[in-house]
């Protein structure tokens, strides 16, 4: 049977000196000191010591976890990673900490997902697929994600958010791109932000975009100058016109407009 010979308060922990035991000193948190009534001259067996140290791992883990979640909401996976990074290595103790915090609603992956999704909807910046990928990296399960997205981010809301993004893109690029280029850009941008092709198309159609013929021709002649300069170096005659026509068509210009522009175009020497 061993004995506690001294207790010294340090910055964060208590140093406890022991006699007649395998350990000469141990470091405990205040919660452990109180839980086991640790006092000088208290007798402690090796079995008692194992129980004290096991509880202290849990107590320190809980203290660290509470500190970590005090700044903002965290997922269970984030707390688990944080504890491992801070030398709480007993997986059973970690799971016990997570269980206690979850039971007290201090960790709630469903609430975390709800707040995250609602925030993204409010910002109008992300579709469901992008949101899902971000939340998966936070350690939230697929089941929780699918359920929460279905509850909060209906197709109607998705279309509303996508429409606002599409409208903004239209104002930004409307005079710099042809109608086809603009439509392609809007669809691609919306899909990159996590909206389905179906939702992206509905949002685009809702804009009811129309071509500005004068702007389309200005863009065509500007692009024609660049393409003609490139192909005049190696081609001439019919072959040159074919190469230029194909290049401009790939950029979204109409064949009739291209033919009209080429008919009166003076090629560089």
From Swiss-Prot:
Gene3D superfamilies listed in its UniProt record: Winged helix-like DNA-binding domain superfamily/Winged helix DNA-binding domain
Biological role: Modulates RecA activity.
Protein name: Regulatory protein RecX
Coiled-coil segments: none
Family: Belongs to the RecX family.
Top-rank taxon, per record: Bacteria
A cellular component term, taken from the record's GO annotations: cytoplasm
One BP term from GO: regulation of DNA repair
Keywords assigned by UniProt, alphabetized: Cytoplasm
HAMAP family: RecX
Organism encoding this protein: Lactococcus lactis subsp. cremoris (strain MG1363)
Gene responsible for this protein: recX
Pfam families, alphabetized: RecX_HTH2, RecX_HTH3
Main location: cytoplasm
Subcellular localization(s) per the UniProt record: Cytoplasm
